[in-house]
Regions:
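Amphipathic alpha-helical packing segments from all-alpha helical-bundle domains
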Residues: 116-142, 151-155, 181-184, 188, ...
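Short secondary-structure transition hinges
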Residues: 95-134, 173-176
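Amphipathic alpha-helical linker/stalk segments
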Residues: 63-88, 117-126, 141
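Amphipathic C-terminal alpha-helical segment
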Residues: 96, 134, 138, 158-176, ...
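Helix-turn-helix
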Residues: 14, 18, 22-56, 60
Length: 198
């Protein structure tokens, strides 16, 4: 009979989530492997067995954040209506950030000084924008969106959603500002601004 695996994917995900919470709440100095292991109810041996080292753990956090983010964006159903699809992708972006704010900080704010993702992690991060790029290319090809370089629309759209989401998560918006309503209107205004003119 095979021995049960004690260091499984469930433990790996618990460790990643807790590590992200520690970093986003108290900064990278709060990430002690001993504290992390204790918080999750395991041993430091398990942490080293699953990740190898502290830098490898941070890289795994980065990868996991983009894996979840990419999964959510790829799950958005395409309707063929460029504006509706761009709005839906923007809403999925925000939902992903809200679901995993502790990972979002590691993905986009370089909250761990000196951390540089390895080549595979960097490739995965760049691939998460493919659903947005594909939607824009399809919108241009169908004549719905303006015939401009797709990268211009991609970066502009990404900048809008990333900026608003980052301001929201960091608490830098005025308390009376209703993010939900303004966010969707901003997404729609951006998308319609890129429509082809007759």
């Amino acid at each position: 009979m095979a021995r049960p695996r004690t260091h499984d994917d469930a433990l790996r995900l618990k460790l990643l989530d807790r590590a992200g919470e520690l970093i986003s709440a108290d900064g990278p100095k709060a990430l002690s492997l001993r504290k992390l292991a204790a918080d999750v109810g395991t041993s430091t041996t398990a942490v080293y067995s699953l990740f190898g080292s502290k830098p490898d753990l941070v890289n795994a956090l980065y990868v996991e954040g983009f894996r979840r983010f990419g999964e959510r964006l790829r799950a958005v159903a395409r309707t063929g209506d460029a504006v509706a699809d761009l709005v839906s992708l923007g809403l999925a972006y925000r939902a992903s950030a809200q679901a995993d704010p502790h990972l979002y900080a590691i993905m986009f704010t370089r909250s761990v000084p000196g951390f540089e993702p390895n080549a595979e992690a960097d490739r995965l991060a760049r691939a998460t924008l493919e659903p947005l790029e594909e939607t824009i290319r399809a919108g241009i090809a169908s004549g719905q969106l303006a015939d401009v370089a797709p990268e211009v629309i991609t970066v502009s759209s990404w900048g809008l959603v990333h900026g608003l989401v980052s301001l929201e998560l960091s608490g830098n918006l005025p308390p009376e500002f209703s993010v939900g309503g303004a966010y969707e209107k901003a997404l729609r205004a951006n998308a319609t601004g890129w429509l082809a003119t007759p």
